[in-house]
């Protein structure tokens, strides 16, 4: 009897691990783009050589970070280091020796940011249901040096015209006590399609440990602080495919649930999963020192990176040390037993730094109407190789895709 109870207990607590081994998760995500190194469509070989000679382009310093899709366009973010000609780009239909060539968005003039009027260092992007591209520009070069104020930019994707450009004040962008700040993640809460409508944008400061709320209707900012935004010193060592590095990082990935209006987040250097309900922010019924943050400490077995969420409340997130993608359904108890690994690949999932859940129209017609389904779009980039060195003869950067329903089939991420 005791032995049976023990086995039953182990079966419950280790159920996720058992399921992982019983399912083939290696090819759950399909690679749709891949690069050995990042290169651009400069317009001519002469212009490309000039960019190399001037130092504007150095292929060894270009690292893929984020992505999003709209129509036939796939947008990509390249971390802004010296040698990166453009941080906000689209993938062209041209291919170089490293992979598909990129082109700056909206055009090259925006990438040449000599007076801080263009784009310095796009870090994260999000496309809303009103065909608008929201761009978070950290203003940082080499991830540390601030050369321009951070800003939010909004583009009309139908015309590629700028709708709005808002500089983020210094006392909002940094922790005024430590003077540290790095605005590296965002989530858009669409409330209106009007240019100056009451859309809210949530921005994570992963060095100053804060959550920033931008109100599009009046261009106001609010900086919130909480211990849940801070890194945990126990989890500042990251190991990816046997290579370790140290990083003290706060909020990195966020996802806003369309079902509950919960904003899910976690400090990158932690094993936690947290959330805050945004209804109080929408109704302006809150005080900065009286916001209720919820979540679970040490619910994860490794650090969580980028996040995305489906319309019916399935939260997806990258697991750094596990080289995997996991999910949890917010209709279930927030408990480790309800977290499922749905994709795992030591080769193709080394550090998921960008993640979106998108809606696509299928060519399949049901009763005369096109079938709509959701898919996961992910970036993996071997980020540890920034320290250990990339082999540019090997594939280093990937964009992957999978149908949401296929990923969660026969898992606890299906709604109860």
From Swiss-Prot:
Signal peptide: 1-16
Keyword terms: Glycoprotein, Secreted, Signal
Annotated localization: Secreted
Glycosylated residues, chain numbering: 24, 58, 93, 115, 158, 175, 196, 215
Family note: Belongs to the major royal jelly protein family.
PANTHER family: GH10609P-RELATED (PTHR10009:SF7), PROTEIN YELLOW-RELATED (PTHR10009)
Protein name per its UniProtKB record: Major royal jelly protein 8
Species this protein is from: Apis mellifera
